[in-house]
């Protein structure tokens, strides 16, 4: 489980 895939839901602004 990568936080980037599931973390994007919590921190979509950091990835996007």
Curated annotation (Swiss-Prot):
Induction: By exercise. Up-regulated during cellular senescence.
Tissue expression remark: Detected in plasma (at protein level). Also expressed in skeletal muscle (at protein level).
GO MF terms held by the record: DNA binding; DNA-binding transcription factor binding
Annotated effect of mutating residue 7 to A: Lack of enhanced glycolytic response to glucose stimulation
Gene name linked to the record: MT-RNR1
Note in the entry: Increases survival and decreases bacterial load in mice infected with methicillin-resistant Staphylococcus aureus (MRSA). Reduces serum levels of inflammatory cytokines such as TNF and IL6 and increases levels of the anti-inflammatory cytokine IL10. Enhances the phagocytic and bactericidal ability of macrophages and suppresses MAPK pathways while enhancing activation of STAT3 and AHR. Protects mice against lipopolysaccharide-induced acute lung injury. Reduces body weight loss and pulmonary edema, inhibits neutrophilic tissue infiltration in lung tissue, reduces inflammatory cytokine levels, increases levels of anti-inflammatory cytokines and superoxide dismutase and down-regulates the expression of chemokine CXCL1/CINC1 and adhesion molecule ICAM1 in lung tissues.
One Gene Ontology term, aspect cellular component: mitochondrion
Disulphide-bridged cysteine pairs: none
Organism: Homo sapiens
Quaternary structure, from the entry: Interacts with transcription factors ATF1 and NFE2L2/NRF2; the interactions occur in the nucleus following metabolic stress. Also interacts with transcription factor NFE2L1/NRF1.
Protein name listed in UniProt: Mitochondrial-derived peptide MOTS-c
């Amino acid at each position: 489980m990568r936080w980037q895939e599931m973390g994007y839901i919590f921190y979509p602004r950091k990835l996007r």
